[in-house]
């Protein structure tokens, strides 16, 4: 399999699927980096080799979100090879390879924001419900299920 022809055909495939020129350029850049990094043919890449690639990206201090994007693009490329180029291979990138992305904690309301909120609330029932949520950390569903 001639890699230059495969990448050119992959580019055509992306354009036919109406990807923007920036997306096509980005995909091809990532695929080229990946192919250069590989020391084995694409057909020989194992899940362990993908783990090594993830470690390589982590050593470059890439964020897990970016690494997951790289993996998704490589997954698309392997699917292209398998279904369009009819290359007999197993896609080494699966969902279990994706990195866990830490979610930021929600920020708390400032005192002024809380005051504005309570200025808008007119009845005692709603005030009590919002105070429970704000001061006790209850969720909307938990407050809705409360009985007296």
Indicate where each model-derived feature is located.
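Conserved catalytic core of the tyrosine transesterase superfamily
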Residues: 1-148
């Amino acid at each position: 399999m001639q890699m230059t022809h495969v990448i050119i055909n992959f580019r055509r495939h992306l354009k036919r699927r109406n990807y923007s020129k920036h997306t096509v350029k980005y995909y091809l850049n990532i695929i080229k980096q990946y192919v250069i990094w590989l020391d084995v043919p694409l057909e020989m890449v194992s899940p362990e080799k993908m783990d090594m690639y993830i470690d390589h990206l982590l050593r470059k201090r890439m964020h897990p979100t970016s690494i997951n994007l790289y993996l998704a693009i490589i997954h698309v490329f392997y699917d292209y090879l398998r279904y369009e180029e009819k290359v007999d291979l197993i896609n080494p990138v699966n969902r279990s390879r994706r990195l866990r992305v830490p979610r930021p904690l929600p920020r708390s309301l400032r005192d002024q924001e809380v005051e504005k909120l309570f200025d808008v609330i007119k009845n005692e029932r709603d005030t009590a419900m919002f105070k429970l949520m704000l001061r006790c950390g209850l969720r909307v569903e938990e407050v809705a299920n409360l009985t007296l």
